[in-house]
Amino acid sequence: MEAGAELVARARLICGEQHVITAPAALSVFRSDGLRREGPLPLAAILPGGAPEVTSVVAACVATGMPYAVRGAGTSDRGGALPVADGVLIVLTRMRRMVAASAADDEITVEPGVPPAALGQAVQAARWFEGPDPPIGTVGGHIAETPGITNVGGLDVVQPDGRFVRLRARDPGYDLIGAFPGSRGRAGIAVAITLRALPPG
């Protein structure tokens, strides 16, 4: 079995057949980004439903030697949402759960596919993002594409080699979280994001 077919078969077992898109007509919507630039048609668009599925899909890509790109809502204007040649696209829009919210701590943990505008509905009167109001796209895409975000309190990350790691801002040592905003997925895929509320103003 060639690598593309093997990866698609594995992804269907991991995510369910309905969440692995291979028909060219259906894949065409994943070719462009927020500026309507077009990339190559991916071999498949894979829509995992949670962190374990992302971990397994990335591990399958590594095992089969299949290149992959990661996409949220596809609104990026920096090319980060475009497919790679002869590869697959991991699409995170199914991952829209609010994992935990603490009004007392002014923190919220969400999956990467949550729209930024939805955060205020979970914890009222808190401000989570600089920039447009409401911000477009997804929380994961905003973090991956925007350098200098300073209110990330924690990340659950699937690394490019398929390993899972949990990072917290209070952890001693190097600031690994600080390297993640603006990395465009090169540092891994954030499958859960903890944000601290920004100061008023």
Give the label of every model feature segment.
Residues 60, 80-81, 122, 179:
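Hydrophobic/aromatic ligand-binding patch that stacks against planar heteroaromatic rings
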Residues 1-59, 75-106, 135, 144-145:
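N-terminal flexible segment immediately upstream of the FAD-binding catalytic core
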Residues 97-101, 108-201:
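FAD-binding subdomain of flavoenzyme oxidoreductases
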